[in-house]
Amino acid sequence: MKLLARTLYLWEVGRQVASWSLTSGQECLVLRETWWASMRAVRTRAVHHKPGHCIAMGRIMRPDDANVAGNVHGGTILKMIEEAGVIISTRHCNSQNGERCVAALARVERTDFLSPMCIGEVAHVSAEITYTSKHSVEVQVHVLSENILTGTKKLTNKATLWYVPLSLKNVDKVLEVPPIVYLRQEQEEEGRKRYEAQKLERMETKWRNGDIVQPILNPEPNTVSYSQSSLIHLVGPSDCTLHGFVHGGVTMKLMDEVAGIVAARHCKTNIVTASVDAINFHDKIRKGCVITISGRMTFTSNKSMEIEVLVDADPVVDNSQKRYRAASAFFTYVSLNQEGKPLPVPQLVPETEDEKKRFEEGKGRYLQMKAKRQGHTEPQP
């Protein structure tokens, strides 16, 4: 079968220049199966893929993609994941004749950073649509890193994203999603369970959206106030889609930066993103808004730190709209020594009743995820 591809950035002879390529249809299936075979992992395909239901993208990691430790910034990886997700979901939602739309990111499920990615390696991002409801699309994304000198590849990230199609004529109008065809009825039922679970969790998150991070003067070390941090960012054209709304990947990268600052202030060592709990996008952010991204420590185990990150948007040029909560998530960071081995972290000292409550909630999430990992029997690549 012919390769249906569009090259977005050309390779320049003799130079390492970033490139993206989009592949659809059966060629994408071949790429995905080849990657998984190279890692000795077998993955059953979830749906019957038609052209546009699966894409593969690749880009070489440059020095400006690095964090202060020299590895690829976790926010950069999150941004690449979201770019793949928005392409495939927008393409699918416009696959039938009807009102044109753009897919908006509503939620990112828990994302684990399985292995660091290095500058000079090639990031391979593959995305596929695995479930559709009446008004939402589930996209599963895998990220592989390739050392182009040795040819070795490794799985670095897995993520599940949910999108909703918004009309180009009226961005407050959610359109219907074209259905996909499943190989087995069980796969559709499993997808429906995932949809209902994330829908319930999103509702629970909205109930907690009244929290505000307040600065404290002269806080004591190891307290929540000591490491809490904020970034203020004016949303410009380069942050937005063609329709004037912030890319979800831009928001996620800013959230990861704030979480990293909080973690570094708390332990004062090299830190890396270990995982991201579900990121919920509660409302759209328009061009021209001033966004405040605030992070605070909620829980520490022996070698990990949980940081809650909140994104508030202030439409400064629109007096009719007040400041609102746009997104929220929990990030988990680990402290590393010079050899890249995990270090014990200073234990958080919660002071107020709210801080103690958040600490216990974080402990519950930590123990739940620890039990899930210990009971996970799927062979790892």
From Swiss-Prot:
Keyword Cytoplasm appears in the UniProt entry: yes
Keywords on record: Acetylation, Cytoplasm, Fatty acid metabolism, Hydrolase, Lipid metabolism, Repeat, Serine esterase
Pathway annotation from the record: Lipid metabolism; fatty acid metabolism
Residue positions where N6-acetyllysine is found in the record: K169, K199, K284
GO biological process: acyl-CoA metabolic process; coenzyme A biosynthetic process; fatty acid catabolic process; long-chain fatty-acyl-CoA catabolic process; medium-chain fatty acid biosynthetic process; medium-chain fatty-acyl-CoA catabolic process; palmitic acid biosynthetic process
Tissue expression: Isoform 1 is expressed constitutively in brain and testis. Isoform 2 is induced in liver by treatment with the peroxisome proliferator.
This protein's domain notes: Both HotDog ACOT-type hydrolase domains are required for efficient activity.
Assembly: Homohexamer.
This protein's name: Cytosolic acyl coenzyme A thioester hydrolase
Source organism of this protein record: Rattus norvegicus (Rat)
Lineage per the UniProt record: Eukaryota, Metazoa, Chordata, Craniata, Vertebrata
